[in-house]
């Protein structure tokens, strides 16, 4: 099946040394099982949020700063108007170690209500990290993720939250106060 698609505008700038800036505004989404564009909603498995609340304005901005050869620092801010806002801080370190590479990916999301809070209460802080040793075509990693706050981490219904459990087919692991560990071989 095809992935979901969004309608809107996106700009990227690499005009400053070591800095990539991103900004965009989306007003509609076409789900995988649909033939038309619709307003966006918050994912609401098990009734976590008001999944019927809609928005036609998702804005985001942020950037990636290449601090040094192995280290990239990241910050992004996003708002789904009237539903939720989210800040993201992260760093990615990818350095040689022995005959391979050690990759460490740390992510921190801070989420709260936005505007009229039509999706309901949003109170979440999600910390996740994954450390992976890569040697040739093989990689072995270990990760941990912890959610704090009174609610799950919000994200746009039909999209994929990138929080540290990519490739896990059983769950998105975003419930309130949830803690997960993973060991992964690719």
Question: Could you describe each region identified by the protein language model?
Answer:
Residues 22-26, 36, 64, 74-78, ...:
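Transmembrane beta-strands of outer-membrane beta-barrel proteins
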Residues 18-22, 30, 69-74, 98-104, ...:
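Repeated loop/turn-to-beta-strand initiation elements of outer-membrane beta-barrel proteins
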Residues 3-7, 55-59, 83-87, 123-127, ...:
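Residues that define the transmembrane beta-barrel architecture of outer-membrane proteins
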Residues 9-13, 61-65, 89-93, 129-133, ...:
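Residues on the lipid-exposed face of transmembrane beta-strands in outer-membrane beta-barrel proteins
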Residues 149-186:
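C-terminal structural cap/anchor segments
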Residues 33-40, 86-90, 115-123, 152-158:
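Outer-membrane beta-barrel translocator domains and adjoining extracellular loop/strand segments
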Residues 13-17, 65-69, 79, 95-99, ...:
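Outer-membrane beta-barrel strand-turn architecture
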Residues 1, 25-29, 77-81, 95, ...:
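Transmembrane beta-strands of outer-membrane beta-barrel pores
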């Amino acid at each position: 099946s095809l992935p979901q698609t969004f309608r809107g505008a996106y700009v990227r700038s690499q005009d400053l040394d070591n800095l990539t800036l991103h900004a965009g505004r989306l007003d509609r989404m076409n789900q995988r099982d649909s033939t038309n564009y619709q307003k966006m909603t918050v994912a609401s498995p098990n009734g976590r949020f008001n999944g019927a609340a809609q928005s036609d304005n998702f804005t985001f901005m942020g950037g990636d700063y290449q601090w040094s050869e192995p280290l990239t620092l990241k910050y992004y801010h996003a708002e789904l108007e009237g539903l939720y806002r989210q800040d993201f801080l992260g760093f990615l370190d990818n350095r040689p170690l022995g005959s391979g590479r050690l990759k460490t990916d740390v992510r921190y999301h801070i989420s709260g209500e936005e505007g009229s809070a039509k999706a309901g209460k949003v109170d979440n802080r999600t910390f996740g990290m994954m450390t992976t040793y890569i040697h040739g075509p093989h990689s072995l990693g270990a990760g941990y993720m912890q959610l704090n706050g009174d609610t799950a981490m919000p994200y746009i219904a039909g999209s994929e939250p990138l929080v540290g459990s990519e490739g896990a087919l059983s769950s998105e692991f975003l419930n309130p106060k949830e803690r997960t560990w993973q060991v992964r071989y690719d």
